Amino acid sequence: MATRIKLSLFIGLFCFLSLASAQKSSTDQAQIRGAMEFLASDAMQGRASGSHDELLAATYLASQLREIGIAPAGDAGGYIQDVSGEFNFYREGKKQWNTRNVVGRLEGRDEKLKDQVILLTAHMDHIGIGKPVNGDNIYNGADDDASGCVAVLQLARALAHEKAPKRTVIFVFFGSEETGGQGDQYFLQHPPVPLKSIVVNLEFEMIGRADSAVKPDELWLTGFDRSNLGPKLAKHGAHLVADPHPKQSFFQRSDNYALAKQGIVAHTVSSFGLHTDYHQPSDDVAHIDFDHMEQAIHSMLGPVRWLANSDFKPVWVEGKKP
């Protein structure tokens, strides 16, 4: 009975979101809200790493890429990359694990540049069911990181509805980031393109609220001073500044870091202001600032579009490569 009820909720939410996604604007707030209400709903039970609920999130995200017109780049001609094997965990060391990534591809049109890849990513998992706080035990993960997933979806939608970019753009929703990045570990071991072809990775993490440490319309880039990417994106319209919370070591705390350790210029875009709902049941849709989120996604569209159509290759600052 519980399974049937959950399936009914899933179908109902999916139908609602499909109606919302019929809007034309690439950063339409109804689309953003609909996707957030789906991914961070109580029915998804917090999308715990490696769980059935994470699989539901993956299935939903894959269906959205298909609807948008992004080609599959996962296993066996599909969008899902099944992740299975022995992985490193934050607390338990190495152990067997099963999760999944969602991978889509927008082929570049330029014969000289299409083999260069722009990688846009977010993580779809959160921490699931946990200790009750004020009677609520569902850790919805609206800001962390449903907001990043929706940003990547909206950027994919915009790019897919334009003339194909010169470079190839790959979109990835990683699984099991919260438990140590098992999804990004597997991606690096089984990449859909040669790793050397990935020019840059931008991870989107926690953009659902403004950070009072910077201006209201600004986002920040982890590891800003480690490469020339941030200043270049800012020059092309991104409202990006350096991470105002260096003591938090955010550069090392998201999927981008695993790629950076492989030499890929990889950073995370965020506006996390250290709010107290982090990893709490209160990180829910009710606390998302949708005006900010819409503006944040829109502010990155032009710079990402430029990056996908330029021949610019970011480089690490001497001595700052991980």
Give names to the regions the model predicted.
Residues 164, 174-268, 272-277, 315:
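Metal-dependent peptidase/peptidase-like ectodomains
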Residues 20-72, 114-115, 317:
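N-terminal hydrophobic or amphipathic helices/low-complexity stretches enriched
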Residues 161, 276-322:
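His/Asp/Glu-rich mid-to-C-terminal helical/loop segments that flank catalytic regions of hydrolases
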Residues 8-18:
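Bacterial N-terminal signal peptides
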Residues 23-25, 42-52, 88-93, 133-145, ...:
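Second-shell loop/turn segments in exported
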